[in-house]
Amino acid sequence: MKSKRIVIKIGTNVLQEPNGKLDHKLIGKLAGQIAKIRRYGHEVLVVSSGSVGAGRELCSINESSNSLASQQILASVGQARLIQIYADAFRKHKTTVAQILLTRGDFVQRTYYMNIRNTLENLLKYKIVPIVNENDVVATEELELNFGDNDLLAVYLATLIGADQLFFLTIASGLLKKEKTAEGMRSVVVEKVQELTDEILRHCLPVTSAGGKGGMESKVRSAGMAMSFGIDTYIMDGKYPEGVCAVMEGQQRGTHFVAHGRKIRSYQKWLAAGALNKGTLVIDKGAEQALLKNKKSLLAKGVTRVVGQFDNKDLVEIFNQEGVRLGVGRADCAAKELRQQIKEQNLTNTGVDVRSRKPVIHRNHLFLE
């Protein structure tokens, strides 16, 4: 079996018993399965939620207000407990774990991004299992430093280390769809997804699982992003951790989001799954064709609308006229300058394009989805 690099994301509800306490027995099973995978010669990185839930076992805090302060206290206390439980479970398999806490802000600067990658590469080199969680103590929506849930963090890390496979372990058996039978409607697992379509998204239940931040839609969207980056991704039942090994052995489990075949350069990976976007550009049909079909840079004459305030060298998202996101790139001018060019062009009656021929986003600093 060819050696693979694997990311396993474990959801809060997978780690909890019905009473809300951590399921130590299940964590032990997970450690055993990961140890088995590693014995096959594969490298494994774990993304684990559950710090707030672990904190509830040790702290008596009034959470009625659901305040940021109470969540941060629980995360601070619970993260120490959570990593201790993991360390004890993996020690039984003679495996060392490392704790890594990250925020969205850690991925913004490419230098930091590369430092994270180098650390993870060295941990894997020395046969250590990195266990990563979002740093809930400093990652707040107010500071725009949070991922929102660990689903997106798992995709970013899988992209960062060049993972072959990404597993989302949840309390569902996979992405479910309704199917009409003689006995009535029933739910069946969607076994394979080739493209993330509106039909696929309609299968997602809109509710968020109790105890967690994300729901099925979050996982499906994250899986869709991962497969577009060339990573085979699975959503499956984490209460039966043997399923990961079953997939590794070629069996069908859960929902498989089939990886697209294209290769992505390191810099483009950072553009796609690292940098923090500061604004949005809406482009016309001609510019869309120039980018997608002719592989050209984006010029000012193709921009119809500028959203947000961004500076030269900031990252911006690109949308077409129908509101479909086309990609992301590094702007070679500030929003104020670009708006002024568009305004001047609208005011001129000569028919001559007065906008700069300098690219707004150079092809080398562009990632298209």
Locations of the language-model features?
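C-terminal catalytic "cap/lid" subdomain
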Residues: M1-S64, L68-T96, I100-E369
